[in-house]
């Protein structure tokens, strides 16, 4: 069972929380990315495989080799790696904060856990690791959920939000003039 993380290796990403998973039987950790905390994380996660920074086909192959994707950072505004993992058909365990709230349907495509809670993170990964049928169910649901989230669709959605704000603000601006 390969549990993976992809992202910047920086303190605010809380990759150190992966240490709570190292003792799970049959679980191997794969950490993809680089950053200022890499050396410290190698000490905290001595059994993890550190794969370095990857892009394109290399990154796609890494996602394809994972069984579960874990995102640990509580401050993501978008969560590109969460979306990439879901598009790769991976169940995702992520903090119930920021971007993952829009990308992970708790109990459907993965699990949302309290930010910074290693016990909840471990429990969620354990549940998925122990149940291949649940992983397969979440995998299919995750992929379906992000199929329509192309850059074009996201840009259109963002433009719609801007237009709504402008439309709402215009009457107020006219009154103030």
Language model feature labels by segment:
Residues 1-24, 36-40, 119:
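A conserved mid-protein helix/loop that constitutes part of the nucleotide-sugar donor-binding site
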Residues 74:
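Aromatic "clamp/platform" in nucleotide-sugar-dependent glycosyltransferases that forms part
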Residues 91-94:
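Short hydrophobic beta-strand element within catalytic cores of glycosyltransferases
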Residues 106-107, 111-118, 127-132, 147:
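Conserved acidic donor-binding segment of nucleotide-sugar-dependent glycosyltransferases
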Residues 151-177:
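C-terminal alpha-helical cap of glycosyltransferases
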């Amino acid at each position: 069972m390969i549990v993976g993380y992809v992202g910047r290796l920086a303190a605010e990403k809380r990759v150190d929380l992966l240490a709570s998973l190292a003792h799970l039987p049959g679980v191997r950790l794969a950490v993809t990315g680089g950053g200022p905390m890499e050396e410290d994380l190698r000490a905290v996660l001595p059994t993890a495989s550190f794969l370095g920074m990857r892009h394109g086909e290399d990154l796609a192959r890494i996602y394809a080799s994972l069984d579960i994707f874990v995102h640990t950072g509580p401050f993501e505004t978008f969560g590109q790696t969460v979306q990439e993992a879901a598009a790769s058909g991976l169940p995702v365990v992520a903090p119930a904060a920021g971007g993952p709230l829009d990308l992970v349907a708790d109990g459907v495509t993965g699990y949302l856990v309290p930010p910074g809670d290693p016990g909840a993170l471990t429990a969620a990964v354990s549940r998925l690791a122990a149940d291949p049928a649940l992983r397969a169910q979440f995998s299919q649901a995750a992929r379906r959920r992000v199929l329509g989230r192309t850059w074009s669709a996201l840009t259109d959605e963002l433009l719609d939000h801007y237009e709504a704000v402008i439309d709402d603000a215009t009457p107020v601006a006219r009154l103030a003039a």
